[in-house]
């Protein structure tokens, strides 16, 4: 019995049976079992065994095994009789040979797989190295661009500070100039009156004595000499100005912008010093003139008194001389009286000589006063010359300031151009953030405690901080507008993007945010007030104005307009003539109107809406009336958060087809302007009934939009565009080759901080999405004239 057990063929292990059965599907196990009894197992190996007992390694490499053959080989058993030990041994030997061949084949296959794995690993390493090198180069270029932008912003800030300082100094200089001008006018008037009085004195002196005439002649000669000196001084000043201008030009050619700013500071300081000194000298000159005027008046009064005394003495002398003659002729006069008269006559003559000396002294004092007056005139001339120099210096500073402002403007344009180029190369969705002002119904003036704007160079005009529960949440976008930004400032930033539609690009601009955050005001504004027009009317005005200017270059444009709204996941035509304006019918389900609108996308990426009203437009007035019609038909309602809350998504589309007759070139652009309905919480809006249904539909579509953005950000293979009508309509804008910009509107109300944070986080994800590089639609043939949203 033991010998019988030893000669018996070994039974297969139960584990081997389980593994073999587990690798075969349950429904095919019976078929596999039946098939093994009707076919020759491992026919390839059997044919090889018939030719030779042991195959070489090279021959084994040519043999291939299938999975079924390997399983059959593992399940093969000896078929000899129960006591035929030799037959069993031969059969087991054959099975072992077959297994060796199979094992060798598996070894070769495994070696091949290892070699392929090594090759793939080396290829992967080289690809990763190339990718890391490219990524390093891209980061280096990005850092260089950021450094350039940072440097430009620093220069802009410093130049703006210098500009404000120069403006203040300019205003001070203008005020000082006005005061000096008034003082100069008063001084000139006093000088004219003084000269008139002096002329009168000269005339009286000419009548009184020839010596005064000679003094006046000498004074005239001195005046002529003074005039020649002034002319020579003016010539010297002109030469000095020419030399200074040449020196200034040389400095401008050699110095950089920083040196120019330093020079501006020095000139400003010296100008202030010169103005102060000129002001002091002007005051001294005025005081000297006043003192001289008083001295001249005193001299004139004394001179008049001396003249009166002299005339009186002359009259007395003549009278005495007549009396002497009369006394000489008179016989009854005594010689004693004659001596007395002679003595009186001598005393009168002595008094007259004293009066002459007094007149001479007064004349000398008058000449001294005239000399002082000439010195004052020279001082005034010198002051005027210095004032002209300072005025010239002010003009030079103004020219430099204008040149600096021009350089700042050119630098800002270059920065914007580089920024737009980077965004287009990246293919990202641009995001602008706008904060609306506080309203009387908001929770007090607490914006400063909720919203903050960073002042650093990198984040200036692009960053915004939201504070919630003491935690600051920073965000950075392509542009941030504070509550004081006007509609014109906002449109200026997107004007070039709107212009791209005329150049043949697809452009999409949409506003996102919670209800009551200012989306409709941003997009539509108040068209009846020019300063408060929104992006839609301003964009249309620019497009029509630019198209008219391009007509001189041979361009002719055809424009088509359509407007629709997505209300409760249904499309409504806002320009349909059969549409009822009544609010109740507007709120009715679109299924009851008998018209269904479907969205389709063609192979060119264009989106079409069936049965949608398309209107050809040729003027801004025509579009304004269409906008008014659409505004009356749009679904709006009152909630606790907003008096006129938009209850639907509004889509305005302008299709532009342009043809150049001279070059036969055609461009086709599309401008989509979208006002999304705002997200809202039921606890705050208090929506019930129809309002509740509207709120649920709005939140559902915005949630679908969020899912699409998340899928794009993660670069998933499947993007759920079909989950809502809104995302399916925006598919070419979010996943195509269009230029797309999103406005995220937030409220500064402290009670809306949570919603504002959600909106900003969503906007940050949108800004990180890559949708592809924009592609211009241009051709030499006329394209299909159907309206496209894409």
From Swiss-Prot:
Residues given in the record as ATP binding sites: 513-520
Keywords: ATP-binding, Cell cycle, Cell division, Coiled coil, Cytoplasm, Cytoskeleton, Microtubule, Mitosis, Motor protein, Nucleotide-binding
Coiled coil: 117-316, 347-426
Disordered: region residues: 1-56, 116-139
PROSITE patterns assigned to the protein according to its UniProt record, in alphabetical order: KINESIN_MOTOR_1 (PS00411), KINESIN_MOTOR_2 (PS50067)
An example molecular function term from Gene Ontology annotations: microtubule binding
Disruption phenotype: No visible phenotype under normal growth conditions, but dividing cells of mutant plants exhibit abnormally broadened mitotic spindles in metaphase and anaphase. However, this does not affect chromosome alignment and segregation. Kin14c and kin14d double mutant is gametophytically lethal.
Residue ranges, compositional bias (Basic and acidic residues): 16-33, 127-139
Kinesin motor domain span: 428-769
GO CC term (a single one): nucleus
Compartments reported by the entry: Cytoplasm, Cytoskeleton; Cytoplasm, Cytoskeleton, Phragmoplast
Amino acid composition bias (Polar residues), ranges on this chain: 34-55
Superkingdom of source: Eukaryota
Region annotation Globular: where it falls in the sequence: 1-66
Tissue-by-tissue expression: Slightly expressed in anther lobes with pollen mother cells at anther stage 5. Strongly expressed at anther stage 6 in the tapetum and meiotic cells. Also detected in the gynoecium and the ovule.
Example GO biological process: microtubule-based movement
Domain notes: Composed of three structural domains; a small globular N-terminal, a central alpha-helical coiled coil and a large globular C-terminal which is responsible for the motor activity (it hydrolyzes ATP and binds microtubules).
Family: Belongs to the TRAFAC class myosin-kinesin ATPase superfamily. Kinesin family. KIN-14 subfamily.
Further comment found in the protein's record: By measuring the velocity of microtubule translocation, the speed of ATK5 was determined to be 6.30 um/min at 20 degrees Celsius.
PANTHER family documented for this protein: KINESIN-LIKE PROTEIN KLP-3, PROTEIN CLARET SEGREGATIONAL
Function field: Kinesin that supports microtubule movement in an ATP-dependent manner and that functions as a minus-end directed motor as well as a plus-end tracking protein. During mitosis, is involved in early spindle assembly. Participates in the capture of antiparallel interpolar microtubules and helps in generating force to coalign microtubules.
UniProt-recorded name of the protein: Kinesin-like protein KIN-14D
Annotated organism of origin: Arabidopsis thaliana
Gene name tied to this protein: KIN14D
């Amino acid at each position: 019995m033991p010998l019988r057990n030893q000669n018996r063929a070994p039974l297969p292990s139960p584990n081997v049976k389980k593994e073999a059965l587990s690798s075969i599907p349950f429904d095919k196990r019976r078929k596999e079992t039946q098939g093994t009894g009707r076919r020759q197992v491992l026919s390839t190996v059997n044919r090889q065994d018939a030719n030779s007992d042991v195959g070489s390694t090279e021959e084994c490499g040519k043999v291939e095994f299938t999975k079924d053959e390997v399983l059959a080989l593992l399940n093969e058993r000896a078929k000899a009789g129960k006591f035929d030990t030799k037959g069993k041994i031969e059969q087991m030997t054959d099975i072992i040979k077959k297994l060796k061949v199979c094992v060798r084949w598996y070894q070769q296959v495994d070696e091949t797989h290892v070699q392929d794995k090594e090759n793939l690993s080396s290829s992967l390493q080289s690809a990763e190295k190339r990718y890391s090198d490219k990524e390093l180069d891209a980061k280096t270029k990005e850092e260089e661009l950021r450094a350039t932008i940072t440097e430009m912003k620093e220069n802009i800030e410093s130049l703006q500070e210098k500009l404000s300082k120069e403006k203040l100094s300019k205003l001070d200089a203008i005020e000082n100039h006005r005061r000096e001008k008034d003082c100069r006018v008063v001084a000139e008037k006093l000088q004219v009156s003084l000269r008139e009085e002096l002329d009168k004195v000269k005339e009286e002196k000419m009548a009184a004595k020839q010596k005064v005439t000679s003094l006046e002649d000498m004074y005239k000669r001195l005046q002529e000499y003074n005039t020649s000196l002034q002319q020579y001084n003016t010539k010297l000043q002109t030469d000095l100005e020419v030399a200074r201008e040449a020196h200034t030009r040389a400095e401008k050619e050699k110095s950089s912008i920083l040196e120019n700013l330093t020079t501006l500071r020095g000139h400003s300081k010296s100008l202030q010093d010169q103005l102060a000194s000129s002001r002091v000298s002007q005051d001294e000159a005025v005081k000297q003139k006043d003192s001289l005027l008083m001295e001249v008046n005193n001299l004139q009064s004394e001179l008049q008194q001396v003249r009166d005394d002299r005339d009186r003495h002359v009259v007395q002398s003549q009278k005495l001389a007549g009396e002497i003659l009369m006394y000489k002729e008179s016989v009854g006069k005594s010689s004693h009286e004659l001596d007395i008269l002679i003595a009186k006559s001598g005393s009168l003559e002595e008094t007259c000589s004293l009066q002459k000396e007094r007149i001479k002294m007064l004349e000398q004092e008058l000449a001294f006063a005239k000399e002082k007056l000439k010195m004052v005139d020279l001082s005034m001339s010198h002051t005027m010359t210095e004032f002209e120099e300072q005025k010239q210096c002010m003009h030079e500073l103004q020219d430099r300031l204008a040149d600096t402002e021009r350089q700042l403007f050119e630098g800002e344009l270059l920065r914007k151009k580089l920024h737009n180029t980077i965004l287009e190369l990246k293919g990202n969705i641009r995001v602008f953030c706008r904060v609306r002002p506080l309203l009387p119904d908001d929770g007090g003036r607490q914006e400063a405690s909720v919203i903050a704007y960073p002042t650093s160079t990198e984040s200036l005009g692009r960053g915004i901080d939201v504070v919630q529960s003491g935690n600051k949440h920073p965000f950075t976008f392509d542009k941030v507008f504070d509550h004081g930004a006007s509609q014109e400032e906002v449109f200026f930033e997107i004007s070039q993007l709107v212009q791209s539609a005329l150049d043949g690009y697809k452009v999409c601009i949409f506003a996102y945010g919670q209800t009551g955050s200012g989306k409709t005001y941003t997009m539509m504004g108040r068209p009846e007030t020019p300063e408060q027009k929104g992006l839609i009317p301003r964009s249309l005005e620019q497009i029509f104005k630019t198209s008219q200017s391009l007509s001189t270059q041979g361009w002719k444009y055809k424009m088509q307009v359509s407007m629709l709204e997505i209300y409760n996941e249904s499309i409504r035509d806002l320009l349909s003539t059969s549409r009822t304006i009544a609010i109740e019918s507007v709120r009715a389900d679109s299924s009851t109107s008998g018209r269904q609108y479907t969205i389709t996308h063609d192979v060119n990426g264009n989106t079409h809406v069936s049965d949608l009203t398309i209107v050809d437009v040729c003027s801004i007035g025509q579009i304004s009336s269409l906008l008014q019609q659409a505004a009356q038909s749009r679904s709006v309602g009152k909630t606790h958060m907003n008096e006129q809350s938009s209850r639907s998504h509004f889509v305005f589309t302008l299709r532009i087809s342009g043809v150049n007759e001279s070059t036969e070139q055609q461009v086709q652009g599309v401008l989509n302007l979208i006002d999304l309905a705002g997200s809202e919480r039921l606890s705050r809006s208090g929506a019930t009934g129809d309002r509740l249904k509207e709120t649920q539909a709005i939140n559902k579509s915005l949630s679908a939009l969020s899912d699409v953005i998340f899928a794009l950000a993660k670069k998933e293979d499947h993007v759920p565009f079909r989950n809502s009508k809104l995302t399916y309509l925006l598919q070419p804008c979010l996943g195509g080759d269009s230029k797309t910009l999103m406005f995220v509107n937030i409220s500064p109300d402290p009670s809306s901080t949570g919603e504002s944070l959600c909106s900003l986080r969503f906007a940050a994800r949108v800004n990180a999405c890559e949708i592809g590089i924009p592609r211009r639609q241009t051709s030499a043939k006329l394209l299909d004239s159907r309206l496209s949203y894409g």
